[in-house]
A protein has these predicted regions:
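C-terminal substrate-recognition regions of SAM-dependent nucleic acid methyltransferases
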Residues: 1-172
């Protein structure tokens, strides 16, 4: 059997007919998408090679772990500093989009909750910022569901996870 497909329908090619059907159902609800919550690159204006300070009033999450950083040195994303944040890696998981030995796809290589007074370098994105820890935990758990990982895998076709990678994922 053959099927007709409009290749420009979603802004990205969806390879699997079943996935196309699911995306149609999700988009038909016209709900807000997670892309409206995810930060752009460099959520705090800090490059990957930024190193922590000896002393500071903030905790910096960077590619080698955590360290101290001065609030006075942060000019971008200031409104996020005192919120609970869900942080994800800017790079997608390994295996070039292939399933692991258990047949599971790891789309997000790092997903962590950052407490208030924490920031990160451009190695990471802020997937969402919240007033309470409970909201951050709920969102963190949502990002780890098969539903979200599946929708992300359809559009995250490069090694980078971006705000646009969340264009199919509805806010819950």
């Amino acid at each position: 059997s053959t099927a007709t497909k409009h290749l420009n329908e979603h802004g990205t090619l969806i390879r699997y007919p079943m996935a196309d059907s699911i995306v149609h159902k999700v988009l038909a609800h016209n709900e807000e998408k997670l892309s409206s919550m995810v930060s752009s690159r460099k959520p705090f204006g800090l490059a990957t090679n930024v190193a922590p300070f000896e002393e500071g009033d903030l905790t910096l999450r960077y590619n080698k772990g955590t360290g101290k950083y001065l609030r006075s040195m942060v000019n971008i994303g200031v409104e996020l500093i005192d919120k609970w944040k869900v942080m994800i890696s800017y790079l997608s998981a390994e295996h070039a989009g292939q399933p692991d030995k258990n047949g599971m796809f790891r789309v997000l290589s790092t997903t962590e909750i950052l407490p208030p007074e924490s920031i990160c370098t451009e190695t990471y994105l802020i997937a969402g910022a919240f007033d309470t820890e409970a909201e951050a935990i709920n969102y963190y758990n949502y990002l780890r569901t098969r539903f979200v990982r599946f929708l992300l895998s359809l559009i995250a076709v490069s090694q980078h996870i971006t705000r646009a990678s969340f264009d199919f994922v509805p806010v819950q």
